[in-house]
Amino acid sequence: MLGKKAYKVIGMILAMMLVAGCGAAADETAEPELLLGFSQIGSESAWRIGNTHDIERAAEDYGVSLMFENANQSQENQIDAIRRFIAYKVDVIAFSPIVEDGWDNVLMEAKEAGIPVILVDRDIKTDIEGLTTCLIGADFYNEGVMAAEYLIRKADELGLESVNIVEITGTENSTPMRQRQAGFADTIAGDERMHILESIDGDFLKSRGAECMRYLLDTYGDEIDVVFSHNDEMTLGALPEIENSGFVPGKDIIIISIDAGQEAIDVLKEGRINCVVECTPNLGDELMETALKLKNGEEVEAVIHPVEQAFTDEMDVDSIEPRGY
């Protein structure tokens, strides 16, 4: 039999092993695998809020430490945030640029610091190679194409010989504004029935969507056959203005939107919107996976686009599943 001294020795050894094990576990959790600095444009829409929530959720799922900055619609705030990330020596920087131009200086600072940069949702314009490593986001050009393709089918269905369109665009010089506009315009260019009466900047805001629609109705009235709006928030702002002017959206005026948030899908089901092109905000998993690859020195794809679709009055709209944003 073991004596009391032997039991004490064994107990001490077991206790030391337990402490050592706990210490190792603490060490493993103390240092996250990745420190990611992310600058978000703002919280101007349900889409943007959903995008933020998905990135925060993914960071937690992947064990990534997230430094989050809300720019509140200001490029200056975003540039300041990126400089803070550089000073803090994060492993990777990611941001959704509010506009395409004006990033060269701060991104050169990140490059000189050896910090890779990922673009999320939107692209930038630059003549300097190597400032960013990857773009994760929707194919905005194709969203414009899908919107135009629906309109052409709808015009065929209704037998329209002439189609007058007003366009409420997103923030001027932003990637989605430019590419959605280009995709739409290029697709209808070969159809002589299609005429864009005016394009006006709605800044992706519900309030601006209402203001733009009031102006367009005052200017063109019953000449308007179609409203093509670059996001759901502006569309939802425009609808009451259309109704207050005595028109029935979805019937008197064809309504085409982009984002496919839950509120817009509900209005599609009511028949007040005809087409909503999807632009998913759920980019968190792709962002975390890409950032981890960069931290580990792995190659990443230059562009990552999620698969998207259009929801239209041509389909069984009641079968559309909850959107989550």
Residue spans of the language-model regions?
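Hinge/cleft segment of the Venus flytrap/periplasmic-binding protein
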Residues: 32-34, 168-172, 176, 187-188, ...
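Extracytoplasmic "Venus flytrap"
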Residues: 35-58, 62, 66-80, 84, ...
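Hydrophobic alpha-helical segments within soluble ligand-binding/sensing domains
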Residues: 36, 78, 135-162, 208-210, ...
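Short, solvent-exposed amphipathic alpha-helices that sit
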Residues: 47-62, 143-150, 175-194, 208, ...
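Short beta-strand elements at the ligand-binding edges of bilobed clamshell
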Residues: 68-70, 126-153, 167, 199, ...
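Hydrophobic alpha-helical
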Residues: 92-112, 184, 198, 202-266
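Flexible loop/hinge segments that line or gate small-molecule binding clefts
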Residues: 105-142, 261-269, 315
